[in-house]
């Protein structure tokens, strides 16, 4: 972790952007929540673990990024895994399954894609946990709802019977 922190610090000091995922893996429910440990690692990168959070936030420019797509190329895989877990209580992944899912997610057809760069209100942040909440809220605000999302929502609510 120290090597990763050092890389992040050096990149930011050299005015290079660093893209960091909120958490390891993907949430099956579609809502990836920011891992607090990730934020602590960022603070560690700047040796600010004992400094005020606000001074850390002033030093780095955290930009929440929302990525929405019309179709999920991994939807069938996710649904299958969730169904097997529901039916048997567990699911054992095949060798290279995660790698194959990542490839499918990267290169698979997504339909329309929307990317939005958000902002956070630094004044609203008084703890590392609150920072995670503020980032998550900004990401959710930036998501675009496509017709496929609306259909899925109405289908789950029993308001739509046909596909």
What are these model-derived regions, one by one?
Residues 2-18, 24-163:
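Membrane-interfacial terminal anchoring regions of lipid-handling membrane enzymes
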């Amino acid at each position: 972790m120290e090597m990763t922190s050092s890389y992040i610090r050096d990149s930011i000091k050299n005015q290079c952007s660093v893209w960091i995922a909120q958490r390891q893996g993907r949430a099956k429910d579609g809502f990836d929540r920011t891992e607090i440990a990730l934020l602590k690692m960022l603070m560690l990168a700047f040796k600010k673990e004992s400094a005020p959070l606000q001074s850390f936030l002033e030093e780095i420019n955290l930009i929440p990024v929302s990525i929405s797509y019309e179709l999920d190329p991994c939807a069938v895989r996710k649904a299958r895994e969730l169904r097997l877990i529901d039916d048997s209580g567990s699911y054992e992944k095949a060798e290279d399954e995660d790698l194959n899912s990542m490839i499918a997610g990267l290169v698979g057809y997504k339909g329309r894609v929307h990317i939005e760069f958000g902002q956070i209100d630094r004044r609203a942040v008084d703890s590392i946990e609150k920072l995670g909440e503020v980032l998550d809220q900004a990401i959710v605000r930036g998501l675009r709802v496509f017709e496929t999302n609306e259909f899925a929502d109405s289908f789950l609510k029993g308001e739509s019977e046909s596909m």
